[in-house]
């Protein structure tokens, strides 16, 4: 199955003084944009965020 790249920008919650962007996952934990790779949740869907791109998690796992 081909990867689906998320084209819509993710809604980041906040930035710090260094310009790092943060978001909150479904468990309420914060993740920082530079802490890659990471699993993130957007509108109830699970995404794999790596090197500045977000992929649907189910499509990412099919690559392995």
Walk through the language-model features, giving the residues of each.
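Glycine/tyrosine- and acidic-biased, solvent-exposed loop/turn segments at the edges of beta-strands
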Residues: 1-64
